Each structure stands twice: as structure tokens, then as C-alpha cells.
From Swiss-Prot:
GO terms for biological process: positive regulation of gluconate transmembrane transport; signal transduction. This is Gluconate transport inducer 1. One of its GO terms (cellular component) is cytosol. To S.pombe pac2 in the N-terminal region. Residues 146-163, 217-232 have a biased composition (Low complexity). Keywords: Transport. It holds the Pfam family Gti1_Pac2. GO terms for molecular function: DNA binding. Residues 146-165, 203-248 are annotated as: Disordered. InterPro entries: Gti1/Pac2. The keyword ATP-binding does not apply. It comes from Schizosaccharomyces pombe (strain 972 / ATCC 24843) (Fission yeast).
Amino acid sequence: MTEPGNLQPTFVGFIGTTVDALLLFEACRQNYTHFVDRRPQDRERERLIRSGSVFVFDEVQSGIKRWTDGIAWSPSRVIGNFLVYRQLCKKNSVSDRKRSSKSRSDSDEEEVSAFTVSVPVDVDVASHVNISSPSAPSLSDNLFPGSSFSASSQQNPSSPGSNDIKSEFAAVKNEYVLSPTSPTTSAAFPSSFSSLPLVSSKPTGTPFVPKSPPSSSPSTTNVSNASTSSAPINPRAPQTRRESISSTSSIHYCSSSSLSYLHDTERALVGSLTDSYGFKKSGLIKKTISLMIDGRLHHLISYYTPEDVLNGKLQTPSSFNLFQQLTISKDLLEYKSFRIPPLVEAAESEKISQLSTLEKRTLPSFPYNPFFSSSTAEIDPYHFQGLTLSTSPISGVESSSLSSAISRNQSNLSSFQQQQQFSALQSISNNALNENIEQPPIKMAARHSYPNFLQTLPQYMNDVYNPSGLAFNPVNPNANNSFVNLNLIQFTSPSQALFDYGEGPYVDQKSQYLQPKQPSSNTDSIDQSSYNMSLAASKQFLTSDTQPDVNENYSFISNSIPKNLSTSWNQNMGYHVTNSNSELASQNPLYAQQAVSMESMGNAIQSSAYSAMSTPHGGHYDHYAATAKGKNPLAAENHASGGRLPKVPIPPLSNMRRGSVPIIPSSASLPMRTSGNRFCHYSSLNGNHNRISARTNPYPINNQTMLFTEPLSKERGSLS
């Protein structure tokens, strides 16, 4: 027990949101700061009851049943999970009480109804005492629920009253309480944090008085020193209060009415107590919250003035390193009587902060920020600026003080997810917030060009699309100037698929790629009257037990493949192809290599160079490919031909739709978009055409499972 002269506040600062209060409760539980064990005496009130003082006490341990401070307060108003009171002028408190009493006598029923909706008090959650009936005790005779109440004050629930706090810790009715946080969110907060000692570093009774914030500019301030639970006020740039973000800003917020107070600086500080009573000029605001912890009621009472908060004189607990190391216990986060779950409130506050930060700059309206205008708006100094809530899918970057409790306990992400963080959203935010913000993004337009394929596959793509560990090597020149596609090896053996053909070195590519310098023919034309499809075929691969004669002549398979390509623009692929013989086929063979990953706005993507191609009427030429007899018996040889095949009735697939491009690998189900063409697998065994569609994003990616490797009868020698 502290001596009467040694009573000190638990904390000196500002309690912005519920997470701030929970951090302070947790700090008291772990003895990082202290509970107060008594009320301030009359001679101590002038010293203790001032802006910035925060008192936390255990009702049972301290024996405090009523918190008195000698100040006349207005009726309570609800702000989130808090109750707020505003200091009245003492000379007007009696007349205000009489005036409000008279108005209530005329419309008592309406007043009680409105009060019940905003502050539901007809059920005491803690003690389960019904206080809504006329015979039930009133709230005005005592501070906390569970005690006796008088019927007189129950009829006057919004009366200013005397110095006593009216219904300060009234419990919230069950039907107004939102569901607790989800298990996935709350699991990030363990019940204890073993690395923190449970020993107080300060003597009991000494208040935690935070030092003044550093004088660094806002642009150099470490973002981890900020808090997602409430806005760290910028001490270097005091700003005037905004009337309402939602009314003066062009941003259209989509939030529930229970969180609307976060969008208005005035409401966030004083609630609806604006002009209904005779408030004292530059008077105090009292903000309170009560929780049932370990079966006992704990209360937090804080005092502040709006001017001190807006001018940055008061900082929140979560903006200091001591509290950033604390892990909020699960029982506090999932306290069932919260009107708004703490993390929901914190996320909304941070969203406002981020949008306010972005809106202060002139941003292009499309495509990076379709919801923002180019106007510059005043920044709300109440909310945090430029933070990333660690509960979002993008993780791996140290964010705010709230993330110190969340991200520290998250499971490690795969390298793919970490890369996506930078390649996707961060690319958007960096472009949106760079110094050259006036320059709009370049809009993609139709053009005659070839896809710019990467020469090497990023490591994170190997991790995701190559679970077996085999490397996806691009087509590389070897000693005899042949081009080797090691991607073919994944189907059969680790041997390289090498063979010579006709006009020069050649290696069979994926079915969706057109090979350069193919001999054309007027035979074996394919019906051009139906959908644009690609015919994938495969042949018998020689095995080690059927070694061929190295002197045996090569056998050939003749398949029809399109000679000319359409000039239709494929918006997904971002390139335009015309007349394959003159453009694509005449180019260096490197243009025919496999397509690999191109980073695209956070989604894994899938497509092929062939998806933008269609065959005009009658266009075709033969595709000859030699079997690798004698060269490489174990090599996998896949052949393909493309063209307009007859329409084949097949059962609809779940992801089928008209105008699609090649399927995604069966091992990777990825969200995709499409436009343009269909792709059809052809089974050489049963002759069925399996038309499979998939949605893809704009850039190509490796597709290792495009071809079937069903064996053909060796006697047949060709496709049936």
C-alpha cells in the first residue's frame, strides 16, 4: 500500500483505443506499472486530476466502490468500448440539471429509449442483475454494476448529477456485443510472453511517465514506434481539428456505424458531448473502460483535454517500447462484453490512417488507386500514419507496435509469399507514393511486340511450381548450338532432349509454342470452322530395354500446325502477333523458348505465347519432328500442333468458359483471368478432346503439365 502522499497515476498519456487500454491492463498484471489502491484525497486532486493522468485499479483489491474526483461531469456517452464524460462549469451545473430534468419530464419515454440504444444498461453482464424494471435499483447511487441502485436515478438516466460518476461502468447488453475475434486472429496473441520478466522495473506507486517523443521529422520517424491502436500525435506538426474526415474527404469509407466515430476527430475525443450542456472551456474529458479480469472488475479512468491530444502532448501506451514488448493475453482480447472487438477497431483506425496518408498526395485515379481522387486533403492528426496492420495477408515486414504482438507469433511464410509481398502490393504502394507522383502510370496499349520472357526462373517460383526440386531451366545453347529445354525432362528422365532436324539444330518445345523455320505443306489441313484449339500429341518414348540401332534412320510424324496467326489483340498477354512465318517463325529461336514467371500484381499467373494466336481459314503447315533414336533413348519428345479443330461435345467443367487460354498445372490451382482462345488436349489413345479452360493474368508463367505423355502403339507409328 502506498502512503497517502505518494499516490501517483498508473500512466501519463492518452488512451486512444481499446488496444491501448488492454496494453495498460496487461502491463499492470505483469507488474510493469502499478494499480492504484485508493482514491485521491481532496488535497491530492489538484495534483492528480489533470490532463494525461490515467488510473487503473482492481475493484476488489483496492476496495474502491466509487471513484470521486471533485469535478462536475456531464452524462456519459459511448465511444466504441469506452464511456466519456465532459467537465461542466460548476456555476451552470445546477441550472443545466434542472433544464434537462424539465425537458425529460415532457418526453421521458423517448429519452429512456434513446439512452438504452446508445448505452444498453438493462442487463448487468457481470452480476446478471436486472436493472431495467422500475423496482430495480438505479445507476446513479453507485459507480459499478453489481451494487444497489436507486429508482429515482433510473428515471433520470442522463441527468448530469453531482460529482458521482453516473453509470460509468455499466455493462453492455449481450445483444449489442459483437462476436469475439476469430481464432485465427486471436491465436496470434499467446497467453503469455516468456521473454518478459514478471518483475516491476519501477517501485510500486511510481507512475509511468513517458519521455517526450524525439524531435525527428515525421518522415524519419521509425514506423514501429507508432501504434495501430490509436494515432500518435505528431509533435512537430500541430494541426487544427477537422470537422469530419468522411464529410470533407473524397475517400468513401465502407465501415459500420459502430466504427463511425473513428472517422471524425471530434467524435473520437468528445463523442456527442458538443453543445448540449454548459461545458467548461478547456475543460477535462474523462474516458473510462471496465473489464472483468480473473473474475474481478478492473477499471481504467483517464483524463485529457482535446487540445493536448491534438497538439501531441499526450502519447499512447502503444507508442513506447515498454508496451510494444508486451503480448496482450488472449482472455483480454476475447473479452465477450466488448461492443467492438479490439482488433477490428485497430484495423479500422489504421485503414483511416493509411487512406489519409495517401490522400494528402496527388494520386492517379487508375489503376493504382481507383477510390482516390487527385485532390489533396488535410491529414487527420489523431490517427496513425503509414502503417501496415500485421493481420493482413502481406506479412514479413515489421510494421507497427500492434504487429509486435501479432507478427512475432505468426508462422513463417514461404519464400513465395514473401516475394509476393514485394512484387505485388509493395510495387503498387511504391509507385503510388514515389517522389515523382505527378507522373501517371503508363497505360498498356496494343502493340506489335514479343513477350519479354525471363531468362531465369526466380527461386520462389521454383519453390511453388517445382515441389520435386527439379530446376526449371530456360532454353540454353549447348556445344552443337542445339537448344535444350530441360523442362521436358520432368516427364520422363533427366536426360536432355536433343536431336537434329532438317534445317538446323532443333529441340521440341511446349505444345503452345510455335517453332521457327517450320517447313510448310498443303496437306493434312484441319477444319477451320470451329473453335481455336491446340492439338497436343505425344508418342512412344523409347526406354532403356529397347535400345535402338544408332544407324537406324529417323522416323517422322507429320502433324498439322497453323501457318498463319491472327492479328487479334490479346489483352491478357499484352502482345500482338501477325503472320507467324514472317514475324514469330522467322525470329531467332530464343523467341520460341518457354515462358516463365512475370510478376503481376500479387497473383501467380499462367499463360503461354500461343494463347494470342488463332489460325485463319485454311492456314496450316506440317510440323516434322524426329524421334531421338540413337541420340538419346531416354529423352522425352512431345509434339504438338495447333489449329481450329471441330467442335467436340464434352461435359462442362467447373472453370470452363468461352474464350480461355491453356490450363493451369493440375498441381497449382491459381486464381486466373482469361480472354481470347481455347486450348484442347488431345488423347492419342481414345481420341477425346478435353476442352479445359482456365483464367489467367496478363503475363506468362511456366506450364509444366501442359502435355500428355500417353504412349502410342509402336506399330502405329503416327497419330490416329
